Each structure stands twice: as C-alpha cells, then as structure tokens.
C-alpha cells in the first residue's frame, strides 16, 4: 500500500512539473560502498518511484534537520576521527590509477598483487617460489594514483585471506593453468607467461621455461583458493601445503612500504604475462 501511494505521489509530481516547467530528469550514478559499507537508498520499482527513506536527513537544499539520529551520528564520527588518523598514513606512491573490473586478464593491479605474494612467500619460506596465484575477487577496490594510504590497503583487502605455499608437480600445475584458461579473465598470476586461445591453453612457461611435468614447483597462493574458492582447489592438486598467519593486506603493505623506503614508485602496466584470444 505504501509503495502504491509513493508511486501515485511521484506520478502526480511528474505531471505537475510537466505543466509548470521543464521536465526533471534523474541521472543514475554508480555508488561503491566497499569502503564504508553504506548502501544507497533505492526503490524496488525504480521506473515509477524515487524511493523511500524512513528517517531524518540533511536535504539537498542544505537545510539542517536537528531531530532524529543525525546529530548523534555526527558526534560519534567526530569522536572516532583521532582513532582513525593512522589509516591516513601514506605508505607508498602509485604511478597510475589501477582498476579491477575482473573481466580482463593481465590487469596491472592483479600483476602487482601476484608479484607481491610471490616475493613475500619466497622471503617467508626462504625457498625459490616459481609461481603465484591469487584471485581478482579478493581485491575489492582500485588502487589510486599518487599517494597510497594504509586505508587504501585495508580497503583493498578486507577479507581474511592468508598466504600459503603449495608444492605442485608440473603435470598438476599445467592442469591448474588449463582450468584458469576456461575462466573469463584467468586470474592474477606471477612467474608465468601463458597464451590462451578460445579458452584453451596453447602455451605456458613457468620460471622462464616450459613446464616440466615431473618437476615440483613451489606455488604461492591464498587459503581461499586451496579448497574450492572461486572454483579453484589448489590443495587438491598439491603434494604438500604450508599455511601461515600472514594476511594479504600485510603482504601488500610490506611490498609497497619496501618500495617507498627504496624511493621507488609503484609502476605496473599490462606486461603480456597472460594473453587471451578468441
């Protein structure tokens, strides 16, 4: 009933506008609430209604509503600001904006994350790590151009995905790459160069050479991908798995901080490590 009344009111308002002046057009803008968890108010029947909001708010005309929860929320936000100040610490610098549409292979942001994972695993386990794999879905927001803050890193990796190391025989590593070739955008990888045509793996090199089916390869990945996350089960293919308590956000933080300490800027582009053709 309430929705019906709202629809009628909106239609009447539209009719009044058409008689008194130019027609009002609403622009739809995509909103990303990944940083704050805020969800935009939206009507179920967007073609006939603008939506309902059952609370007080600050109107677009700037009028300040003193009733309701708004003043209390504002006071709470002011109170926690000092506790959040550390999140604004600059930890590195990025040469260019890096998005994550998850529909393309060889994304710069994915290359960065996979390289960071591979480097961290090699340092942590003190062994050569020939290949690294992580998922685009675990990278939740783009990396901004210019200064990169701790808040950016925390927001990029909100999930508790932990670094791990798996030992895969070359034959199983090839099958893993064949599985990734069937997906729309492969995934974020490091230490390999692959070519895919019509979602079939046609070429693959790891550690600068064709894959030896009998060789054991050290593969850095995340626990989410060990047992079926995103349809990938690295653990089922592995002869040995080592877990850690190292979160992916810390992997990235260490990598970027080391670059910053060395006076280096993060500068990633597509580099052809994964080529997918129709």
Spans of features found by a protein language model:
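N-terminal Sec signal peptide cleavage junction
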Residues: 16-17
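N-terminal, post-signal-peptide region of Sec/Tat-exported proteins
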Residues: 48-95
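Sec-dependent signal peptide recognition
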Residues: 2-9
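Acidic/histidine-rich, surface-exposed loop or edge segments in extracytoplasmic proteins
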Residues: 85-103, 231-238
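Feature captures C-terminal
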Residues: 21-62, 107, 111-123, 127-278
